[in-house]
Amino acid sequence: MEWSLTQSKLLAFHRLMRTDKPIGALLLLWPTLWALWVATPGMPQLWILAVFVAGVWLMRAAGCVVNDYADRKFDGHVKRTVNRPLPSGAVTEKEARNLFVVLVLLAFLLVLTLNAMTILLSVAALALAWVYPFMKRYTHLPQVVLGAAFGWSIPMAFAAVSESLPLSCWLMFLANILWAVAYDTQYAMVDRDDDIKIGIKSTAILFGRYDTLIIGILQLGVMALMALIGWLNGLGWGYYWAVLVAGALFVYQQKLIANREREACFKAFMNNNYVGLVLFLGLAMSYWHF
């Protein structure tokens, strides 16, 4: 594993891991924090919290590397991705593979400090991270796999805290899948024309002219499931206000994507960071109050 770590190469690795674009890490972080706060409840151990926060960053970076590796033959034909490190030649295929291995090993070393159940679940997390980028070649539902990959930290968090996977865990996991399909469809709407030309599949293409309607239905599903989690765990009204604020953000996103303009769809996608934040704040304040 020989690398020439020049400043330009380090910058290329930085871009390949998307450390300059934290939105993906944040969309992975919020459900992880939801799970830790519900599982504890409201008082996660500092070390477990640190392991999951660091693990989120490492696995998101690894996911970006394997995603670009899988798409390296396609990205050169898409306006938004033509200058990414792999299609531009700033990073070689071997360097990308090596970087992926290093990131995954670091994440696994962190997981090894947790219990056996969490370690076993981490194997599935790796499988999902590896499989997702290739799904867009074979199915119009890669966003479902993305939702499972981004949400797998939820059962891992419950396992790390209690070595159990209660109903709230799976409801939250399902809510995260619905949310991920909604926001990644918004993201896919940005590249829809290019994806059709080069044969990449997505829910944005599958949903067609019903895209905004289906996104809205998915968003309602997220709100219903998150409200049910609140009821099951006896959370206070502050949490339900947070769910309503998240709903208002979804309405705003619907307004943005109504005309299906690229910049507006991307703005709607980015707005989901606030959805995750608001729901976490609702959980944190509810547990703090009690």
Swiss-Prot record:
One GO BP annotation of this record: ubiquinone biosynthetic process
Keyword set, alphabetical order: Cell inner membrane, Cell membrane, Magnesium, Membrane, Transferase, Transmembrane, Transmembrane helix, Ubiquinone biosynthesis
Additional remarks: A mutant in which deletion of the last 50 residues is combined with the 'Tyr-56' mutation in rsmG is highly resistant to streptomycin and has a small colony phenotype (which grow slowly and are resistant to aminoglycoside anitbiotics).
Subcellular locations according to the entry: Cell inner membrane
The name this protein goes by in its record: 4-hydroxybenzoate octaprenyltransferase
Requisite cofactors: Mg(2+)
Superkingdom in the source lineage: Bacteria
Membrane topology qualifier: Multi-pass membrane protein
Cross-referenced PANTHER family: 4-HYDROXYBENZOATE POLYPRENYLTRANSFERASE, MITOCHONDRIAL, PRENYLTRANSFERASES
Family: Belongs to the UbiA prenyltransferase family.
GO molecular function: 4-hydroxybenzoate polyprenyltransferase activity
EC number per UniProt: 2.5.1.39
Annotated GO CC locations: plasma membrane
Pathway named in the protein's UniProt entry: Cofactor biosynthesis; ubiquinone biosynthesis
